Design a protein with these regions (language model features):
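Beta-hairpin "wing" of winged helix-turn-helix
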Residues: 64-74, 81
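Short capping segments at the starts of secondary-structure elements
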Residues: 37-43
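Pre-recognition alpha-helix immediately N-terminal to the DNA-recognition helix
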Residues: 29-31
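Helix-turn-helix DNA-binding motif, specifically the short coil turn and the N-cap/start of the second
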Residues: 41, 52-55
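Amphipathic alpha-helical dimerization/coiled-coil segments
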Residues: 1-15, 84-103
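Alpha-helical residues within the helix-turn-helix
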Residues: 47, 58, 64-65
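Residues within the alpha-helical elements of helix-turn-helix
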Residues: 34, 48
């Protein structure tokens, strides 16, 4: 219950703005698609794009700040995974608008 309240607060206002900003970029959406299949290191993600590693790092940082991905450092590598809880909360919020006249 407490976690649900915290996540709902995160999705309201600034957190929601960060979330939609992160989803607004095609590179970040592609990164999310990749992470939906398996966890990847920053280097593995960067290898899939024709852009600099600092640019990919910036995209990953925005996704992390929005709560869409989580990162774990293992030795000299940083591994990224989806934070599916935020996606669940976003879907729950969006479904409220599906048919507001029926309850």
């Amino acid at each position: 219950m407490y976690l649900d309240i915290c996540l709902n607060i995160q999705l309201i206002g600034f957190g929601m703005n960060q979330l939609f900003k992160a989803l607004n970029d095609p590179t970040r959406r592609e990164i999310l698609e990749m992470l939906g299949k398996k966890d990847l290191s920053a280097g593995e993600i960067a290898d899939q794009f024709n852009m600099s590693k600092p640019s990919i790092s910036h995209h990953l940082d925005l996704l992390r700040q929005a709560g869409l991905v989580e990162s774990v450092k293992q030795g000299q590598f940083i591994y990224y995974s989806l934070n599916t809880t935020v996606f669940d909360e976003l879907l729950k919020w969006m479904l409220k608008f599906r048919n507001p006249k029926k309850k």
